[in-house]
Amino acid sequence: MLVVDDEPLIRWSLVEMLTASGHTVTEAPDAASARRVVRDDSQRPDVVLLDYRLPDSNDLGLLAMIRREAPDTQVILMTAHGTPELARGALDLGAYRVVSKPFEVHDLTALVSEAYASTH
């Protein structure tokens, strides 16, 4: 599992929560780091929890790259600025789900587990 978020506190909280739920988690603070992880076959995650707005990628380009290069990886897009158009665009590109920040811990861990189960 890969968590991609540029906000250190949010990223740390997500990593802690998902680790406590039994997931092995890698983290990336930006799109460039996420690309390296996804492209490395030894690290390729089954699920990516991806923040929509990153300093080096504020569109759906990273989502498209992940779906193209790792088609079996499920991507959950997180956003604090969601619109129906963004959700539709993300789902059209193959996002597993789009979730709005803030979210309930239980809901997110259940969604991650569901996404992970769909890869096996």
Can you say where each PLM-predicted feature lies in the sequence?
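C-terminal output helix
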Residues: 85, 103-113
